[in-house]
């Protein structure tokens, strides 16, 4: 799965985590538990189980986001697309095993009128979200390892 490479706001990040890919996957795949380890997420609820086509709703920032899983390949890749307040987002996490644990790559794109008008602020917000999310994921996965 790929993010929208033509979108006006794209953010990427990577982090090394001292936990096996299966542990990192379990943290990412437990959608309902996201608010317990990621302070940027206030609510999260998955309906239909973790599979392509399933929908989850979550609250991050001022709006509630409705997202649909586009890719679910345990414990390698998870990706979704979603909409909130006129913003179209596409997000992907890729996990690669390493000698010390897991390298996680995250990428997200934002598109929509408001993103096009406020490109700079949108890019900064998106990059801060990727960086903060990866740091929180690392902390939780290493705690569970």
Go through each PLM region and give its residues.
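A short, structured loop/turn motif at beta-sheet edges
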Residues: 18-22, 70-75, 94-103, 144
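Hydrophobic pocket/interface hotspot
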Residues: 24-28, 34, 56, 69, ...
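Beta-strand/loop substructures that line and gate deep hydrophobic ligand-binding cavities in soluble
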Residues: 83-132, 137-139, 143
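Hydrophobic ligand-binding cavity/cleft-lining segments
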Residues: 1-45, 136
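Glycine-centered tight beta-turn/hairpin loop motif at sheet-sheet or coil-to-beta transitions
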Residues: 8, 62, 86-88
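Beta-strand secondary-structure signal
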Residues: 12-14, 55-57, 79, 92-94, ...
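Hydrophobic/aromatic beta-strand elements that line small-molecule binding cavities or substrate pockets
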Residues: 13-15, 65-71, 82, 90-97
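Short beta-edge strand/loop motif at the mouth of beta-sheet-based domains
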Residues: 12-13, 32-64, 73-77
